[in-house]
Amino acid sequence: ILLLVPTSYFIYHWISEETISDITPGTLGGELILSDGKSFNLSDNNLPENAVRAFVIDSKGINYQIPANKPQVKEIQNILRTLQGMECLITLSDGTRVHLNAETRLTYPVCFSSKERIVQIEGEAYFDVAPDKEHPFIVKTSHTSIRVTGTSFNVRAYADEDTESTTLISGTVRINSGNEEFELVPNQHYTYNKNTGTN
């Protein structure tokens, strides 16, 4: 279903700020799960950092800062999981900013090194994607694939809900739900029904 809809509170709260990175101190909360299975609470101060896990954590969230002179490495996947009542902002290695709503799980590479920038999400998040026409950004949910080059949009895909939805704020996105593909324009809303397999 494609609809023109008012902006939800979650989206409006973040795009109405002077900048998306202005997160109020104290809202940071969640768990970082590294590729080796080790997990850390974001409030801890003893998080590891090495050549392929170069990040800074502060009151604004997680900011990946991969040095330009580091050799290209295979894509190592980390997971950021927010807890109930918590939110978190993460800046990925390409500069894309993702604001995770409560009870959301984002799987992403520490450093994008392939032709496509691919992340996976379960829950709800607002994406402000860094433009890069040569390396499309793809967000995968359990039932859809959202392809962009540089744009802002919201994805809601909680496992315990009957639908998945995408709301486009700016730019364009293409959504693939199996045999069908849709292109959204700003302020357009896409919904996929998991029970019926229909859009």
Please name every model-derived segment.
Residues 167-168:
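Propeptide (latency) domains of metzincin metalloproteases
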Residues 164:
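Conserved active-site beta-strand-loop modules that form the wall/rim of enzyme catalytic pockets
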Residues 2-161, 174-197:
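Short acidic/polar, Gly/Pro-enriched loop/turn segments located at secondary-structure boundaries
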